[in-house]
Amino acid sequence: MNKEIFNSKLFEKLDKDNLIENSREWSNEIDSTWNYNDVVGILKSWESLNTISLEYIDSIVNCLTETGKDILINGSPEAKLYNILTEQGMSPADANKQFGATAFGSAKNKGWIEVKAGKIFKKVESINDIVKSDLSIPDLSKLDSKTLEQYKKSRFIEEKKLSYYRVTKGEQYNKRSKELSDLTIEMLKDDSWEKESFKVNINAMGVVPEQGYRHPLNKVKNEFKQIFLDMGFEEMPTFNFVENGFWNFDALFQPQQHPARELQDTFFIKDPKTSHDFSDEYCERVKQVHSVGGYGSLGWIYDWKLEEAEKNILRTHTTAVSARMLYKLAQNGFKPKKYFSIDRVFRNETLDATHLAEFHQVEGVIADVDISLGHLIGVISEFFKRLGIDNVRFKPAFNPYTEPSMEIFGYHPILKRWVELGNSGIFRPELLLPMGIPENVRVAAWGLSLERPTMIKYGLDNIRAIFGNSINVNFIKNNPICMFESK
């Protein structure tokens, strides 16, 4: 549309009548090809300058349906049936197939057609298509109420909600001037810009700046962290992705010939290949309990090797951090503690819908006098209850460093099966006593996956959709807020 012509017509109308009662009807009268959205855009630009005032009005109007528009062009169904008839006639079946039974009945009732020898023929020389005439009037609401209702039932006419503006003169109407689109150097030099009006709408929304987006896992991680803090836990430092085999395996009473310590399950560091950050006295006690036993245990009965314990690896679990914290706790004089950590761990696993080589582990440790497996089940159940996940199941299991041990499962509504969330249990005396932990102290611990509860909450069936190098960036930008409702 031509903006100059529009503005000319707009101000010509307001100068003459002081108002435009219906912006939609007025613009259609001026030029029916104008897009009404463009019309509204120009009106609002003048409103922003207080040149005009707009009053928004909703109205219910009667409009032609697609069927009604077809009648306006091609005639009513009964008229089309009449016009197609020839001297050879047409069978009622063909008529019904092409135009419907209603057209045949209506044409017959109006006396336009008749049936002879099983065929339809014209009964009159000419017809007056009243339906087409009725639908052609500009204001359909002027039809008598009975006819209007009949056409609505026939779905020729429908009611629509149409909005328009009542336009009147604004405070700055008489001060309007031609808007300039460019600010020139000359205007700045002679201050003439102060007298001009520019095409700038300071109330218009600017472009939303691109910004960083928090990863869904970080959102869930923060919720997990807050739940732990609310339950009285203290966060452990987990900044060491690289551990040696001593803290990751040996201190946890995991034998050196265990399959988890093989190349197919663990990532070994090439350089530096080894490290030694543990005391010789503690190392000797760990070696003793592995090799020949102690503290009421037979041990694993094998030749324990220091060089195996010194090998650097990418930690396979954050329980290595728990081992360091418990050892430190024992050296400084034991006090009951509740620790937690949430960080990355690494496993040389086969990738599938629920397994990654790099993922996050949620670790919890409770150290106190005479606690039991029942305490552990209660704490884990309460933790998941606060996450809003009630469908949790425990299953007896074996772990080298806990006895008794349990696997934790959660039901995945998308996969429609139970998904393993983590492991738990009571730390063995062979792990705790060499550290110097008192004999009457029990330590309950568990390791949970961060990704899998997140998958359940976000309704995902593939772990690679939420973490890893193949994640869709748009998922990070556009994912909805997913809150874990405390219960």
From Swiss-Prot:
InterPro entries: aa-tRNA-synth_II (IPR006195), aa-tRNA-synth_II/BPL/LPL (IPR045864), Phe-tRNA-synth_IIc_asu (IPR004529), Phenylalanyl-tRNA_Synthase (IPR002319), PheRS_DBD3 (IPR040725). It catalyses: tRNA(Phe) + L-phenylalanine + ATP = L-phenylalanyl-tRNA(Phe) + AMP + diphosphate + H(+). It is found in: Cytoplasm. It is an enzyme of class 6 (ligase). One of its GO terms (biological process) is phenylalanyl-tRNA aminoacylation. PROSITE patterns: AA_TRNA_LIGASE_II. This is Phenylalanine--tRNA ligase alpha subunit. The lineage of its organism: Eukaryota, Amoebozoa, Evosea, Eumycetozoa, Dictyostelia.
